[in-house]
Design a protein with these regions (language model features):
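Bacterial N-terminal signal peptides that target proteins for export
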Residues: 1-9
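Bacterial N-terminal signal peptides
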Residues: 9-17
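N-terminal active-site segment of His-dependent metallophosphoesterases
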Residues: 21-109
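Extended active-site neighborhood of metal-dependent phosphoesterases/phosphodiesterases
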Residues: 32-55, 106-197, 217-238, 246, ...
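Hydrophobic beta-strand anchors of alpha/beta hydrolase catalytic cores
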Residues: 63, 94, 166, 198-199
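Active-site glycine-centered loops adjacent to acidic/histidine catalytic or metal-binding residues
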Residues: 68, 98-99, 132-133, 203, ...
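Short active-site segment of divalent metal-dependent hydrolases/proteases
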Residues: 71, 101-102, 135, 206, ...
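Short acidic, glycine-rich surface-loop motifs adjacent to enzyme active sites
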Residues: 191-211
Length: 268
């Protein structure tokens, strides 16, 4: 047993010593990005009221959503999603629920894959991006905030006679953190009744507490329970989540939670 431990330690150490940008094992387990508290503060610096804008739509509208593309060398599934989404005249916008990339410095490849190309697309729909745990490895947050934007924000879908509220929460490190949590609960209590529907977009889902994603884990049980109770008591309509690469549809307290499967090529 001791010999096996020594061999594993040696192999792991050897990988760390010879790693380059394409195989930075250390960065996968020890994120050098800032924590959720700082990410929230920096999001406010970018958008002081965290308002990401307005989408105009009809009373009944369509939006496309996918999770966990994990773009590495290929992005065939994301290409299929993007082509269908950007050639659908009924679509109002798109959402990617985090884990956009899988390796260091690969965010530009993801953004190119999800971009609008007039030679093959008919509609330049807006895409909203959610921060996932893989997106903060290898100092990924610095890249994300400069090329994409804040990790916490909200936007409206406005239609004749009303509007819907979408809120994107940063759960990339498996917690909202006290500052984001206070802002979110205060925002819901003040503004929820002004909207027809309220939809939450986030990466780490609230129902799995089994540390199913190794180094990032899932939400602490106490935080999940408190958050789920709050959402149910404030008439939130829908929560869209990813992270576990497993599709599930859960209803609790008249609130629907949809966990999306991964769109990554390896998940074909």
């Amino acid at each position: 047993m001791l010999q096996m431990v020594k061999q594993i330690s040696f192999i792991f150490t050897a990988i760390l010593l010879c790693s380059c940008n394409h195989l930075d094992i250390k960065g996968m387990f020890v994120s050098s990005s800032v924590g959720v508290q700082t990410r929230f503060e920096q999001s406010i610096d970018m958008y002081p009221d965290l308002n990401a804008g307005v989408i105009e739509a009809q009373e009944s509208y369509t939006f496309y959503v996918a999770a966990d593309p994990h773009v590495d060398k290929t992005h065939q599934n994301l290409d299929i999603f993007n082509d269908k989404f950007r050639n659908d005249g009924e679509a109002s916008f798109g959402v990617i629920l985090g884990d956009c990339t899988d390796v260091r410095d690969n965010l530009p490849n993801y953004l190119q894959a999800i971009d609008f190309y007039p030679e093959r697309h008919d509609f330049d729909h807006k895409v909203f991006h959610v921060l996932g745990n893989h997106d903060i490895y290898f100092n990924g947050w610095n890249d994300f905030k400069s090329k994409v934007g804040p990790s916490t924000y909200w936007f409206e879908v406005v239609f004749p006679g009303g509007k819907d509220l979408f809120i994107t929460l940063d759960t990339a490190t498996g917690t909202l953190g006290s500052k984001q949590s206070r802002w979110f609960k205060d925002f819901i209590e003040k503004h929820r009744q002004s909207y027809r529907h309220c939809i939450i977009l986030t990466h780490t889902n609230f129902f799995y507490t089994d540390n199913s994603q190794s180094s990032s884990g899932n939400m602490p049980m106490e935080e999940s329970f408190s958050l789920i109770e709050f959402l149910g008591n404030h008439e939130v309509s829908l929560v869209l989540q990813g992270h576990d690469h497993y599709r599930e549809d859960i209803s609790y307290k008249n609130l629907r939670y949809i966990v999306l499967g991964a769109i990554a090529d390896k998940s074909k």
